[in-house]
Curated annotation (Swiss-Prot):
Sequence similarity: Belongs to the class-II pyridoxal-phosphate-dependent aminotransferase family. Histidinol-phosphate aminotransferase subfamily.
Subunit and partners: Homodimer.
Enzyme class: transferase
HAMAP family: HisC_aminotrans_2 (MF_01023)
Reactions accelerated catalytically: L-histidinol phosphate + 2-oxoglutarate = 3-(imidazol-4-yl)-2-oxopropyl phosphate + L-glutamate
Source species of the chain: Moorella thermoacetica (strain ATCC 39073 / JCM 9320)
UniProt cross-references to NCBIfam families, sorted A to Z: hisC
Domain of life where this protein originates: Bacteria
Name of this chain's protein: Histidinol-phosphate aminotransferase
N6-(pyridoxal phosphate)lysine: modified positions: 248
Involved pathway(s): Amino-acid biosynthesis; L-histidine biosynthesis; L-histidine from 5-phospho-alpha-D-ribose 1-diphosphate: step 7/9
Gene name linked to the record: hisC
GO biological process terms, semicolon-separated: L-histidine biosynthetic process
């Protein structure tokens, strides 16, 4: 017969009315204790569930309001019977299409499960505990997140007039600096760094520091002085990598496809940490088809330009200041607590992004939508601000 011994802890539990013991779990790495999980824009379905609002528009995550290219949708459908197969781990056909479009070689390309994965690869490849990255403030938060996961830290350089202060960023580089991020156009401000400014900045960056040019929104830029960053790679510049995505103008955010362009040596090192089969089969075929549909890209630019002009005029009529944008979103000062206005907009079926997460409590970041979406947003905003 087995007799279970009564331990002191068991007796204490019995004395307290059989309370559940507190679970002891394995200790996580110190580096991640200070990390705050990324909070994405609310999905439409979540707002419908929580608030019971039937008609909801999302202007929070800078997606293409026209959706994906019809050619991409057709490619998905035609490839659907092959999803039992592993995808091409090398993304050969997508690299082939990108190389032809960009004027680079396939060995200059790395494909990721969104550019977020490439940011993770960069941190895993270059960041040791105690290393630093240099970023603008405000900018895309995933740069800091990727560095923190590896035990690094972000040196944040405040923007000037909502633009990168490149001189201050160059001055912030130390022997501990491994990566410098230039989000161009910048998220959330929509401002850009021009060709001359970027050329001058790169001359100040040591060869040992990799400059990451995040051009997720470059397809929307109309400014003539926007940099031709691919020329750096074609010329063999060894400390630059360009990141671009299929999540914005190509309308494939739900499939997660992004890519990096750099000299082969950088690509080789990033491939050391890349997961096998990291880009799924459907994402690859859709991206190839989307890349070839220039008419859809052109229409998307047209809708964005018209929407930008409309929102500018409406903000001005409301007496609201905004940051002129080169992207598909606008950073606007609503002169009230953005969190409260955000909640009121949700009740009216409009999802936007609050500025407090970027350090601007009275700002909203609003994706430029279709004419109907823009009018719905402005109508709701007018009612709230009245």
């Amino acid at each position: 017969m087995m007799v279970r011994k009564s331990t002191a802890s068991n007796r204490r539990l019995q004395d307290k009315g059989d309370e559940e013991p507190v679970a002891t779990v394995p200790k996580c790495r110190e580096a991640i204790l200070s990390i705050k999980p990324y909070v994405p824009g609310k999905p439409i379905e979540e707002v419908q569930r929580e608030l019971g609002v039937k008609d909801v528009i999302k202007l929070a995550s800078n997606e293409n309001p026209l959706g994906p290219s019809p050619d991409a949708v057709q490619a998905l459908q035609e490839a659907s019977d092959r999803i039992f197969l592993y995808p091409d781990g090398n993304c050969y056909y997508l690299k082939e299409a990108l190389a032809a479009k960009l004027g680079v070689k396939q060995e200059n390309l790395i494909i990721g499960n969104g550019t977020d994965e490439i940011l993770k690869m960069l941190a895993e490849t270059y960041i040791n505990p105690g290393d630093e990255i240099v970023v603008a403030d405000p900018t895309f938060s995933e740069y800091e997140f990727a560095a923190q996961v590896m035990g690094g830290r972000a040196i944040k350089v405040p923007t000037r007039n909502f633009r990168h202060d490149l001189a201050a960023m160059a001055a912030a580089i130390t022997p501990r600096t491994r990566l410098v991020f230039v989000c161009n156009p910048n998220n959330p401000t929509g401002t850009i760094v021009g060709q001359a400014a970027l050329d001058g900045f790169l001359k100040q960056v040591p060869p040992s520091v990799l400059v990451v040019l995040d051009e997720a929104y470059s397809d929307y830029v109309t400014a003539e002085h926007y940099p031709n960053s691919l020329a750096y790679v074609r010329a063999g510049r060894a400390n630059v990598i360009i990141l671009r995505t299929f999540s914005k103008i190509y309308g494939l955010a739900g499939l997660r496809v992004g890519y990096g362009v750099a000299v082969p040596e950088i690509i080789r090192d990033l491939n050391r940490v890349r997961e096998p089969f990291n880009v799924n089969l459907l994402a690859q075929v859709a991206a190839v088809a989307a890349l070839k549909d220039e008419a859809h890209v052109g229409k998307s630019r047209e809708v964005n330009s018209e929407g930008k002009d409309y929102l500018y005029s409406q903000f001005e009529s409301l007496g609201l200041k905004y940051v002129p944008t080169e992207a598909n979103f606008i950073f606007v000062d609503i002169q009230r607590d953005s969190r409260e206005v955000f909640r009121q907009l949700l009740q009216k079926g409009v999802i936007v992004r609050t500025g407090d997460i970027f350090g601007y409590d009275t700002f909203l970041r609003v994706t430029i939508g279709t004419r109907r979406q823009n009018e719905t947003f402005i109508r709701a905003l007018r009612e709230i601000l009245a």
